[in-house]
From Swiss-Prot:
<feature type="binding site" description="axial binding residue">
    <location>
        <position position="98"/>
    </location>
    <ligand>
        <name>heme b b566</name>
    </ligand>
</feature>
<dbReference type="InterPro" id="IPR005797">
    <property type="entry name" value="Cyt_b/b6_N"/>
</dbReference>
<dbReference type="Pfam" id="PF00032">
    <property type="entry name" value="Cytochrom_B_C"/>
</dbReference>
<dbReference type="GO" id="GO:0005743">
    <property type="term" value="C:mitochondrial inner membrane"/>
</dbReference>
<dbReference type="InterPro" id="IPR027387">
    <property type="entry name" value="Cytb/b6-like_sf"/>
</dbReference>
<dbReference type="InterPro" id="IPR005798">
    <property type="entry name" value="Cyt_b/b6_C"/>
</dbReference>
<dbReference type="InterPro" id="IPR048260">
    <property type="entry name" value="Cytochrome_b_C_euk/bac"/>
</dbReference>
<keyword id="KW-0812">Transmembrane</keyword>
<keyword id="KW-0830">Ubiquinone</keyword>
<keyword id="KW-0408">Iron</keyword>
<feature type="binding site" description="axial binding residue">
    <location>
        <position position="197"/>
    </location>
    <ligand>
        <name>heme b b566</name>
    </ligand>
</feature>
<feature type="transmembrane region" description="Helical">
    <location>
        <begin position="34"/>
        <end position="54"/>
    </location>
</feature>
<feature type="binding site" description="axial binding residue">
    <location>
        <position position="183"/>
    </location>
    <ligand>
        <name>heme b b562</name>
    </ligand>
</feature>
<feature type="transmembrane region" description="Helical">
    <location>
        <begin position="114"/>
        <end position="134"/>
    </location>
</feature>
<dbReference type="GO" id="GO:0046872">
    <property type="term" value="F:metal ion binding"/>
</dbReference>
<comment type="subunit">
    <text>The cytochrome bc1 complex contains 11 subunits: 3 respiratory subunits (MT-CYB, CYC1 and UQCRFS1), 2 core proteins (UQCRC1 and UQCRC2) and 6 low-molecular weight proteins (UQCRH/QCR6, UQCRB/QCR7, UQCRQ/QCR8, UQCR10/QCR9, UQCR11/QCR10 and a cleavage product of UQCRFS1). This cytochrome bc1 complex then forms a dimer.</text>
</comment>
<comment type="function">
    <text>Component of the ubiquinol-cytochrome c reductase complex (complex III or cytochrome b-c1 complex) that is part of the mitochondrial respiratory chain. The b-c1 complex mediates electron transfer from ubiquinol to cytochrome c. Contributes to the generation of a proton gradient across the mitochondrial membrane that is then used for ATP synthesis.</text>
</comment>
Length: 380
């Protein structure tokens, strides 16, 4: 009998074991779709980004007009640009839901997969930040100035570090050029990290909504989940194209329609919506270094999640107290996102400080306590 090429060829064998014959738990829900959605987001962003890069000029005098030129004069340039800008938003929606899924169902107990995932999140955040600077509008320029300036809070080396990153004494042409280079490079780094992420995942296999071992009941990835993933792609592309075609500037900042001007500061400097929760945490501490540390901690705290798992059950499926805490955390993040978009004045300052305190308290204190309490209640 002739050998099956799909199972014997060195390259096809890899693809086969990852996407075709992969044994998958039969009961994984739609929450397990977000991994493949992130993959398709990355592909879409790389493709649209490549097409945009062919028409973009990384120079302070030309960047803004080159983006305008792409939208006006390039065939479907407006569509490519709108898909790329809003694709970033969908990328973040998917990654936040993906992290939330991992948190709810205890997937973080696959430590290597979880840790590479956090590194992926940090790389994605860096990519989105440098990308936001490229159109060289007002919010691009001032966002770059404010965020890079935070590094100057690092004792002793801070100022040198910032000037080294800027390539001068302020955000200027060298900054834009290197940000473009970084924005081109990082997505390929993300693709590489995603492969590492998958390699670690396939070591242990997928978790499932019950949080129990599923070796006794697994089904092949293809056709069951390949088809389910395609349905997921369609469901995601529908709102993405709707947004890009009907309301492309809904999530953007109107300030970015004004070319960058170092002499005029916008009244409210704020990042894109997907960074607002972290921005609110940064602003809630009235000290530069303290704010920077809190900002870093807001994402890096995820590394501690596997160490703070005290429950004897993996998923939250059968843990109502932890579920209540989880949804409180979600609501808390939404409040932080809203506060981050508001000006720094009376009610918002205290709301932001309370929400920031609650965020860290829930993650570092309440989750382990409630986990241990649930063990007690179930006589474990």
């Amino acid at each position: 009998m002739a050998p099956n090429l799909r199972k014997s060829h060195p390259l096809l064998k890899l693809i086969n074991n990852s996407l075709i014959d992969l044994p998958t738990p039969s009961n994984i829900s739609a929450w397990w779709n977000f991994g493949s959605l992130l993959g398709i987001c990355l592909l879409t962003q790389i493709l649209t980004g490549l097409l945009l890069a062919t028409h973009y000029t990384a120079d302070t005098t030309l960047a803004f007009s080159s983006v305008a030129h792409t939208c006006r004069n390039v065939q479907y340039g407006w569509l490519i640009r709108n898909l790329h800008a809003n694709g970033a938003s969908f990328f973040f929606i998917c990654i936040y839901l993906h992290i939330g899924r991992g948190f709810y169902y205890g997937s973080y107990l696959n430590k290597e997969t979880w840790n590479t995932g956090i590194i992926l999140l940090l790389t994605l955040m860096a990519t989105a930040f440098v990308g936001y600077v490229l159109p060289w509008g007002q919010m691009s320029f001032w966002g770059a100035t404010v965020i890079t300036n935070l590094f100057s809070a690092i004792p002793y080396i801070g100022q040198t570090l910032v000037e080294w990153a800027w390539g001068g004494f302020s955000v200027d042409n060298p900054t834009l050029t290197r940000f473009f280079a970084l924005h081109f490079l990082l997505p390929f780094m993300i693709a590489g990290l995603a492969l590492i992420h998958l390699t670690f995942l396939h070591e242990s296999g997928s978790n499932n909504p019950l949080g129990i071992l599923s070796n006794c009941d697994k089904i092949p990835f293809h056709p069951y989940f390949s088809l389910k993933d395609i349905l997921g792609f369609i469901i995601m592309f529908l709102p993405l194209t709707t947004l890009a075609l009907f309301s492309p500037n809904l999530l953007g900042d109107p300030e970015n329609f004004t070319p960058a001007n170092p002499l005029v500061t916008p009244p409210h400097i704020k990042p894109e919506w997907y960074f607002l929760f972290a921005y609110a945490i940064l602003r809630s501490i009235p000290n530069k270094l303290g704010g920077v540390l809190a900002l870093a901690a807001s994402v890096l705290v995820l590394f501690l999640v596997p160490l703070l798992h005290k429950s004897k059950q993996r998923a939250m499926t059968f843990r109502p107290l932890s579920q209540f805490l989880f949804w409180t955390l979600v609501a808390n993040l939404l409040i932080l996102t809203w506060v981050g978009s508001q000006p720094v004045e009376h009610p918002f300052i205290i709301i932001g400080q309370l929400a920031s305190l609650t965020y860290f308290t829930i993650l570092l204190l309440l989750f382990p306590i409630i986990g241990a309490l649930e063990n007690k209640m179930l006589n474990y």
